[in-house]
C-alpha cells in the first residue's frame, strides 16, 4: 500500500472559563470593485468590511485597498485601529462603485509589500470573484507570483459570494498562503459571513 499525503485541520479550544487573550493583528482588506462585481455584491462587501473593522481592537492595525485595474489604498501603510481611523475607513468605503477591469495581481501586490509587525500575524482578506481581466490572467502564474512575493509574511483569506466565482483560483491562492477561502452561496449572506 502506498502512503498518501494528507492534510488536517486542528482546532484548539481552551478550558471553559480560561479564554486565551486576543493577539494583536495586522489586517488588510483587498476589495475587488471592478465591473464584474455587481453593485449589490459590492455593497454587501463594504458593509461586512466596515463591521469587521469596527470589531478590531486598539492594538490591531488595518488597511483597505480597493482594486480594479489599479489599486486605491485607504492609507499608504497599516494604521492603528483607533476610533478616528475606523470612522475614516467608513468614509473611504462609503459609495464605492463597481466599474472598470480587474487586475487581481496589482490589487494585492501593494499589500504584500507592506511590512507586518514582528511577532504579529499579518492577514489579508481578498474579497473578489477571482476573475482577472487585466494584468496576470493565468491563474497558476498569478498564484505562484503572489505566493513568491508574499514569502509567508501574510496569511491570505479569500472570500466571495454568489455563483460567478473562480473558486479554484481563490481556494489555491488561500491554500498556498496559509489561509482559507469561503464562498457564500447567496450574495445576501456575504455581509454576515465576512
What are these regions (language model features)?
Residues 1-194:
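Exposed acidic/Ser/Thr-rich ligand/metal-binding surfaces
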Amino acid at each position: 500500500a502506498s502512503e498518501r499525503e494528507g492534510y488536517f485541520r486542528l482546532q484548539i479550544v481552551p478550558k471553559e472559563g480560561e479564554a486565551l487573550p486576543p493577539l494583536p493583528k495586522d489586517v488588510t482588506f483587498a476589495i475587488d470593485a471592478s465591473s464584474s462585481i455587481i453593485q449589490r455584491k459590492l455593497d454587501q462587501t463594504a458593509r461586512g468590511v466596515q463591521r469587521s473593522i469596527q470589531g478590531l481592537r486598539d492594538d490591531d492595525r488595518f488597511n483597505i485597498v480597493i482594486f480594479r485595474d489599479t489599486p486605491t489604498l485607504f492609507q499608504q501603510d497599516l494604521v492603528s485601529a483607533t476610533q478616528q481611523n475606523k470612522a475614516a475607513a467608513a468614509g473611504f468605503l462609503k459609495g464605492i462603485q463597481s466599474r472598470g477591469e480587474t487586475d487581481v495581481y496589482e490589487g494585492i501586490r501593494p499589500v504584500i509589500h507592506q511590512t507586518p509587525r514582528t511577532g504579529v500575524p499579518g492577514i489579508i482578506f481578498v474579497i473578489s470573484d477571482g476573475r482577472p481581466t487585466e494584468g496576470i490572467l493565468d491563474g497558476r502564474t498569478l498564484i505562484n507570483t503572489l505566493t513568491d512575493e508574499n514569502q509567508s509574511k501574510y496569511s491570505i483569506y479569500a472570500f466571495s459570494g454568489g455563483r460567478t466565482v473562480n473558486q479554484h483560483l481563490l481556494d489555491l491562492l488561500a491554500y498556498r498562503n496559509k489561509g482559507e477561502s469561503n464562498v457564500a452561496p447567496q450574495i445576501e449572506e456575504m455581509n454576515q459571513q465576512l
